Amino acid sequence: MTTLRLLSGGAAHGLVERIRPSFESRIGCTIDGTFSAVGAMRDRLLAGEPADVMILSRALIDALAKSGHVVPSSVTDVATVATAVAVRRGDPLPDVGTADALRTALAAADEIHFPDPAQATAGIHFAGVIKKLDLEEQVAGRVKLGANGATAMRALAASTAKRPVGCTQETEIRATAGVVLVAPLPPGCDLVTTYTAAVTTRSQAAAEASALVVALTITGK
């Protein structure tokens, strides 16, 4: 049986799991997926790790198409995901409906969990939000970075702090036990990321890989 190797941003994990049983049965293959920060997944492909399909942010997939690592004609948007605020399950939900309210909530938090800006789309953006809200120095000692969104949310769930908050892609929040989604980031601080799939140029199972991209597209929409 063919095994399809997938390297994907963590935000697409739930989408892949939704289609996995029916796709594997229908196509007669298995999906071997790794999910983490989009930058880390790109780096693994560039380092030579075998992969048949990539799911990353649109900008990273476009760059891989330009560099010859994915097939340009296979590039397909599969989902859009908002970056959102989270708290531990059972904690009060802070008001984050405006930029000023978000600033107040972050200033009151004793821990702020989000993915590493060096690798993750949500992390890059949220670090910029903190700077935009002029909180960079004030909260520097409270920032807790995870290798990816899922790791950051698990750390938030396990936190023993009094008022921790977190931020990552909404799909990663929903997929993590022990945390709840408060709301997407407010206007002026918001981010909606387009996740895009593509077949790699080194794929040894191009037909099956293309079928996976199609299945993801149908389910994502």
For each of these PLM feature ranges, what is it?
Residues 1-34, 39, 43, 47, ...:
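Exported/periplasmic ABC-transporter solute-binding proteins
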Residues 52-53:
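Phosphopantetheine-dependent thiolation modules in NRPS/PKS and related acyl-activating systems
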